[in-house]
């Protein structure tokens, strides 16, 4: 199975630009009900990610007023070397990679590192189960 059948499209995932604030990242996570925000530049090149876990750890570590924390620039805290998968990869490799790295959400990029979408582990498993049920 190709990974492209399991990708959440760009208009259905949290995306912000690298000049956004942490509050915008949280707003996007809440809007799309996902625990990751993808950071892109103007040509959709993936620049980084920040997860709800990253933000939770920052809050505990920083110990500053929430208003000051939320107004900080995302670039101060984002992971600018995220794990990704290529759009041409297959589902088995992708799921093995996610399992091995304990990743729930994996950005999908093309050869130019442009963001294509996101694989969310639970949604991928849901589709796999649906396919198995149909076959039986």
Give residue ranges: language-model regions.
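Tandem CBS (Bateman) regulatory domains
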Residues: 1-12, 47-86, 90-100, 115-136
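The conserved cystathionine-beta-synthase
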Residues: 15-34, 40, 84-102, 108-110, ...
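Acidic (E/D-rich), amphipathic helical modules within compact regulatory domains
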Residues: 23-61
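Append "Primarily bacterial transcriptional regulators
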Residues: 44, 112-113
């Amino acid at each position: 199975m190709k990974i492209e059948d399991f990708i959440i499209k760009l208009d259905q995932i949290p995306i912000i630009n690298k000049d956004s604030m942490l509050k915008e990242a949280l707003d996007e996570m809440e809007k799309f009900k996902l625990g990751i925000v993808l950071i892109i530049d103007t040509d959709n090149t993936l620049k980084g990610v920040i997860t709800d876990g990253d933000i939770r750890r920052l809050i505990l570590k920083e110990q500053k007023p929430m208003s000051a924390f939320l107004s900080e620039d995302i670039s101060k805290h984002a992971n600018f070397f995220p794990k990704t998968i290529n759009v041409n990869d297959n589902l088995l490799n992708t799921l093995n990679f996610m399992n091995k790295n304990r990743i729930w959400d994996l950005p999908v990029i093309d050869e130019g590192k442009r963001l294509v979408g996101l694989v969310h582990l639970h949604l991928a498993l849901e589709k796999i189960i649906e396919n198995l049920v149909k076959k039986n």
